[in-house]
Amino acid sequence: GAVPCGKDGRQCRNHADCCNCCPFGTCAPSTNRILPGCSTGMFLTR
């Protein structure tokens, strides 16, 4: 299921610890230094 995350609280279909949402709705862990909360890969929900 989608989970709210990011500053705007939009829904993300994929979840990661401390996730934020990108314009494309993908999530990334907060440890991403280059693009915080952004990733081209998807993190599947456990």
From Swiss-Prot:
| Modified residue annotations for D-leucine | L44
Q: What one GO molecular function would you report for this record?
A: sodium channel regulator activity
For the keyword Oxidoreductase, the answer is no
Cell location: Secreted
Pro-segment residues?
Answer: 46
GO cellular component terms attached to this protein's record = extracellular region
In this UniProt entry, which cysteines form S-S bonds?
C5-C19, C12-C22, C18-C27, C21-C38
Q: Which PROSITE patterns match?
A: I_CONOTOXIN
Main localization of the protein? secreted
Q: In which tissues is it expressed?
A: Expressed by the venom duct.
Q: Which domain of life is it from?
A: Eukaryota
Keyword check for Secreted: yes
* Matches recorded under InterPro entries: Conotoxin-I_CS, Toxin_19
Q: What residue stretch is flagged as signal peptide?
A: none
* Assigned keywords, A-Z: D-amino acid, Disulfide bond, Ion channel impairing toxin, Neurotoxin, Secreted, Toxin, Voltage-gated sodium channel impairing toxin
Q: Which Pfam families does the protein's record reference?
A: Toxin_19 (PF08088)
- What does the UniProt function comment say about this protein? Iota-conotoxins bind to voltage-gated sodium channels (Nav) and act as agonists by shifting the voltage-dependence of activation to more hyperpolarized levels. Produces general excitatory symptoms.
Q: Which family does the UniProt entry place this protein in?
A: Belongs to the conotoxin I1 superfamily.
> How does the record comment on the protein's domains?
The cysteine framework is XI (C-C-CC-CC-C-C).
Which protein, by its recorded name, is this? Iota-conotoxin-like R11.18
> From what organism does this protein derive?
Conus radiatus (Rayed cone)
